Amino acid sequence: MDKITYAYLETTNYCNLDCSFCNRDEVIGSLKHMSLDDWGKLLDGIKHHPIQEAKLMGMGEPMLHPQFDEVCRMFKEVFPKCKLIVATNCQYNINDKFRECMKYIDMLYFSIDGYKESYERDRSPAKWSKLLKFLEQFKSVDRYDCDVVVNYVVNAYNVQDIRKVDKLRKENNLGQLRLNIAQIWDADIKMSDDIATSGYTEKDLNYLRDNWNEQIMGKSKWDFKDCFWVNNAIYTTVEGNIKMCCMNTGAEPFGNLFENSIDEIRLMDDYQNVKKGCQTNNPTSHCQNCSYKELVPILNYVGV
């Protein structure tokens, strides 16, 4: 069995925003913060895998977990050499627990999608003024060795805001600008059915290609057989449920880490069927509307 080298682990599904490209209301269960006891059990259940990179995020704002500093510390205790990544929406006041988290996080994404009006539209009820206040507070935070970057989800309505946000990034001494073309996380909806994810004008695409192609994340040469999720990754929800990837958050779980081991779950028929479908470029219904696959022509056009 292939070893897991990448983990996407959700420790809370609480969130203070209702972003336009997030389907959390359709897929989450009861609001929950994972207990430190359960978090310890989860880590114990996957510690035999050589995880090299992990993202502590999911359908919630990670920093809303009341013990997220301990969550990060415990993870690094089990996986000291693993690159730990966290994304935050910056819509809160920085406190001592946030400052403590910085000791353990290797890369921190500040999610800033758009400028002023478009930011508040797509990340409602976020306020631009709150973001600016957060950035001002962050100036006094010890970053330790954490690489703090800007993550920008590009859609058909905020393409022209990129340069303004890049200026804000530089003014606040932040790292790389990471542009992610917006995707659909619902397997029942195609990107082509949504104007925000498919309505780019030729002018927009040319602008992205000519000015920002080095900042755009993703691979233009990709097919189902290239999917790393089915071979080397794990996606867990706050309940401990195992799903295949973050592109299909609405899928039925393959199992639960608090009921079966991760290795047992990955050997189950349903899991293996999805894996084999990707490996043979004959995807099952689970992957038929994969938004990453739909993204390939756009990434190819903009020269990624």
What is the role of each PLM region?
Residues 56-60, 87-89:
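Glycine-rich beta-strand-to-loop/alpha-helix junction loops that act as flexible
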Residues 16-24, 244-247, 283-294:
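Local cysteine-cluster metal-coordination motifs and their immediate loop/turn environment
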Residues 1-21, 51-57, 231-240:
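N-terminal pre-triad scaffold of radical SAM enzymes
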Residues 10, 25, 29-34, 44, ...:
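Radical SAM enzyme [4Fe-4S]-AdoMet core and its adjacent flexible, acidic
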Residues 7, 11-12, 34-38, 42, ...:
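SEC14/CRAL-TRIO lipid-binding/transfer domains and related phosphoinositide-recognition modules
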Residues 88-94, 154-158:
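Short beta->alpha connector loops
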Residues 65:
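Active-site-adjacent beta->alpha loops and helix N-cap segments on the catalytic face
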